[in-house]
Amino acid sequence: MRTEIRIAGFGGQGIVLAGAILGEAAIIAGMEAVQTQSYGPESRGGAARSEIVISDAVVDYPRVACPDVLVVLSSAAMRKYGTDLGENTKVVVDDDMVQMEVEGAERIPFAMTADALGRRIVANIVMLGYITNKFDLVPRKSMEESIFKRIPKGTEELNKNAFQAGWDLADGKKPKIPKKDKKESKDEKKKDKVGSKDKKGKTKKKSKDKKESKDKKNKGGDK
């Protein structure tokens, strides 16, 4: 069976990375996969598209002719890459980033969920969690392995939470958003307090210096 997936958005949203992760996840799972990409000359903000063909047999044609699944993360990308759809194409759009009306599309808050997690850059991982669960494209274990092979070190927990949030959205659940570290917040407040005291201290010293200068002037006048 051959499945064609197109992921589209703009530069800076991790569109190409998401496609590469999905393609590699399919290979990890023992399937055949081909991933192609295209993007504008701008490093950020220009149109970007990643296409993935997954099959249980050798992929003889690497291009997406008519996507089975279309995921779009911006209005401009919807206008550019959402034209050659079939009757059975499943369309998913970002509820916040795609503001135009898209008939029959599922509207999912990928970007807003990523914002709640603290970093909008992981909206692509939220999206991967969603489509992995919703469309059963590849096994969850394979997808997670592929994600952790490609993300920067030190971001494992954030990406793990992003993937789970997307998975929960596909189940119709409200994603669990980890609470921010209270200690960090207290330390910041403490710093602000200390900074405020220092400022007051400097003001008092300045006033004292001014008084001493005035006293010296008066003494000079007596002579």
Where are the regions a protein language model picked out?
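Active-site cofactor/cluster-binding pocket
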Residues: M1-K193, K197-K205, K211-K223
